Structures are given as C-alpha cells and as structure tokens.
C-alpha cells in the first residue's frame, strides 16, 4: 500500500505581520499546529507526529520565526528533504510595511522579540528583515498584510492556502451580517433573515450559531427545517455540476441581521452535510465572529 502524502505548511515572516492569526486559522481548519518550533527539532517533531496516525494523511502547520533562536537558513535546506518523509512542505512568508508594523506595535504595546538587544523598534524591525531575508527569498508565497484587517487576513489564508488546490472542488461556507455588506466573492448568497431569530430569546442572545442551545432552538423551528431541506437539495444538485464543469472553488454565503446566530448555524450545518456527502475540501468562515 502506498504511504499517504502529508501536507506541511511552514509559517514564517516578520513579527507583527499576522503569523499568529494565520496559524490560528489553520488550527480552526483542523490542521495540527505548533508555534515557535526550533528548526533543529522539526524532523524529530514530524517523525513523532506522523507515527501517531501513520495510515492517514496529516495536515500540519507550524510557526518558525526569529523567536526560535535557530539558524533559519537551515529551514529551507530541510524543506527540500521533506519528500523523504513523504511530506509536501510549503513555506509561506508573512510581511508588512515598516509603517504598518510600527502602528501595530503601537496599538498593541507589545515588545518586539529582538528588543532585548537594546534596539529601538525601527532598528529591531530592520534587523529582523535582514535575518529573515533568505526565508523570504525561498518562500513559495509572500503575503503582504499591510492592507489587511484581521477578517481579510483570515479569509485570504482560508481561500489561498488552507484548502488544498487540486482537481477537487473546494467549498467555503461563510456567514455574514447584511448590515456590513454582502461578501463580493460569494458564488451563492442565501438570505436567512426570514427565519426565527434566536436574538430575541434572552437566554440565547449572547451565544452564536455554533452553540448547542442555539442549534437546538433552530432545529425545533419548522421553517428552518424546510429552509435547510430546500437549500441542501439545491446545492447537492448544482455543486456536483460545478465540479463537472471544472470549477475549483465555490463560496456559499448565508446572511442574517447580525451575522451571529442564523447565518452561522446554517453555514455550519451545510459544511457538516457537505463533509457527510464526501466533499473533502470544506471550510467555514464566520465574518462577524472573527
């Protein structure tokens, strides 16, 4: 039997560029994640991890950056030997302009990892750029996050990197609030504002469509059952047609007033249904919860 191929995403880049947000996004999509791993421990870490489930494919994301104190130049050398472990390794480098990084540090009041060297913040950023330049040069993708907010960065990671780009149709089920606008990239948009709203139940108001109490409430509503049944039938028919038409990526968006209860519930339910139907590349994104 041919051993399974494993996917490894290596996240590196400048401090303050959004690496932690990216790693958390991969974790939310069921990647096994580890942050601040020294390069020299990477082979040992992967050998142990792959032995845990050696008969199944593994999706792993790790963060390696200036905090590890390792010789970062060894990372690219190791990446090219990963195929011997039957691992497809991808290096992503997160970057941002100096002005953006300075503003983010001012907003968060966090210390730069190199500040212990007695450097000013601009000097620390400049030194980090110099030390990580070989990784930036070797990366398969450089993601400049200067113009991204948190929501845009998470969505970019999901659509561009977290879902496998292959001959399979990748599905993203998204929730949103109409008051903040319809996602322009959505292929299908469904309006859930006609459905009963858990917001008006005081005990449910602080919860979201991910919570069991909200799910229980929604599943007791006849209109919700009818709505889900009809949309499920529609998508079961047309998603298969879209894959046959060589589409590689489809976004299905559900909207409600606040983007917290109904739309989240529907996106989660449709994602679960899609996985049960055999779609392997499925993700959810809840714009107003991020």
UniProtKB/Swiss-Prot annotation:
ATP binds at residues 13-20. Disulfide bonds: none annotated. It comes from the Bacteria. GO terms for molecular function: ATP binding; GTP binding. Gene3D superfamilies: P-loop containing nucleotide triphosphate hydrolases. InterPro entries: P-loop_NTPase (IPR027417), RapZ-like (IPR005337), RapZ-like_N (IPR053930), RapZ_C (IPR053931). GTP binds at residues 65-68. Keywords: ATP-binding, GTP-binding, Nucleotide-binding. Displays ATPase and GTPase activities. HAMAP family: RapZ_like. PANTHER family: RNASE ADAPTER PROTEIN RAPZ. Belongs to the RapZ-like family. This is Nucleotide-binding protein Xfasm12_0753. It comes from Xylella fastidiosa (strain M12).
């Amino acid at each position: 039997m041919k051993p399974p191929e494993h996917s490894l995403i290596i996240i590196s880049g400048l401090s303050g560029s959004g690496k932690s947000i990216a790693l958390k996004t991969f974790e939310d999509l069921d990647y096994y994640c580890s942050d601040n791993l020294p390069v020299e421990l990477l082979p040992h870490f992967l050998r142990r991890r792959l032995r845990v489930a050696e008969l199944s494919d593994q999706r792993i994301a790790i963060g390696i950056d200036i905090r590890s104190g390792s010789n970062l130049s060894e990372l690219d050398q190791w990446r090219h030997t990963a195929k011997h472990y039957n691992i497809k390794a991808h290096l992503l480098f997160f970057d941002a302009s100096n002005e953006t990084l300075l503003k983010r540090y001012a907003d968060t009041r966090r210390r730069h990892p190199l500040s212990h060297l007695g450097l000013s913040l601009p000097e620390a950023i400049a030194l980090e750029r110099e030390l990580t330049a070989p990784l930036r040069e070797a990366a398969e993708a450089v993601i400049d996050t200067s113009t991204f907010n948190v929501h845009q960065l998470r969505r970019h990671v999901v659509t561009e990197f977290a879902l496998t780009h292959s001959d399979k149709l990748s599905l993203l089920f998204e929730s949103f609030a109409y008051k903040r606008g319809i996602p322009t990239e959505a292929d299908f948009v469904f309006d859930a504002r006609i459905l009963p709203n858990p917001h008006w139940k005081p005990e449910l108001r602080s919860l979201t469509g991910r919570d069991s109490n909200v799910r229980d409430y929604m599943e007791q509503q006849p209109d919700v059952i009818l709505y889900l049944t009809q949309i499920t039938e529609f998508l079961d028919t047309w998603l298969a047609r879209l894959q046959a038409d060589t589409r590689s990526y489809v976004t299905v968006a559900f909207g409600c007033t606040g983007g917290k209860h109904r739309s989240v519930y529907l996106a989660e339910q449709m994602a679960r249904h899609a996985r049960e139907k055999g779609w392997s590349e499925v993700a959810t994104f809840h714009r107003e919860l991020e």
